[in-house]
Amino acid sequence: IRVGAARALAQAGLGVAELDHIDLYSCFPAAVEMAADMIGLGHDDPRGLTLTGGLPYFGGPGNNYSMHAIAEVVGRCRSRPGSNGFVFANGGYLTKHSFGIYSTAPAQGWMRIDPAIDQIEIDAMTSPSFTEAPSGQGSIETFSVVHDRGLPAWAIVIGRLDDGRRFLSQMVDGLDALIDRPAIGRRIAVVAGHPVNRARWV
């Protein structure tokens, strides 16, 4: 997201501060927060992060939500000639990204940039190694508690072993401790399992 947004803004000759109308694809709050962080927008930016009210409230048939955001940003740019709009869309598991810059004032000297240049930077980024069969102690990176009939049933836990490897696991006991106080960074133990890895508090 960071690389793509920076490229789109650079090609338009604009900075984040020069954007007047902003819409970030809003399938889930995490998608909006991650995009804002990568683009350089505050979560409470006074310009707002949606032009429609957001996908959960505005809707949009099928995969068509961002078309409505584009239509809205075009209308706003036309009503304020010279203003600039930005629409970010994503798909997959936050793995496919689209960036659009809109204005009534065309960028001067615009030229296409080969996306392979940006792909080189993306390919050079480091990420933790992943293990499908974790064993040992580590810490929680993030989690989601699954509820059944209003009660916590189990949790998906993404963690990092002490050796740095990332893992995916399930937790079934001690779920209140995930909900009642901050859990990110807390210590857990994990054992490989079939069909799922199991995490527990230490």
Predicted features, each with a name:
Residues 36-39, 155:
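Flexible domain-boundary/linker segments
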Residues 16-24, 45-53, 80-90:
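Beta-strand segments within the central parallel beta-sheet cores of soluble alpha/beta enzyme folds
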Residues 10-15, 20-24, 58-64:
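Extended C-terminal subregions enriched in glycine
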Residues 1-6, 26, 32, 38:
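Acidic, glycine-rich loop-and-beta core segments that form the ion-binding/anion-interacting portion
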Residues 4, 38-69:
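Conserved catalytic cysteine-centered active-site region
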Residues 30-31, 58-202:
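Conserved beta-strand-centric core segments of catalytic alpha/beta enzyme folds
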Residues 10-17, 39-48, 76-81, 107-109:
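Secondary-structure transition/capping motifs at alpha-helix termini
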Residues 1-12, 69-73:
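Short, well-ordered amphipathic alpha-helical segments that serve as non-catalytic structural scaffolds
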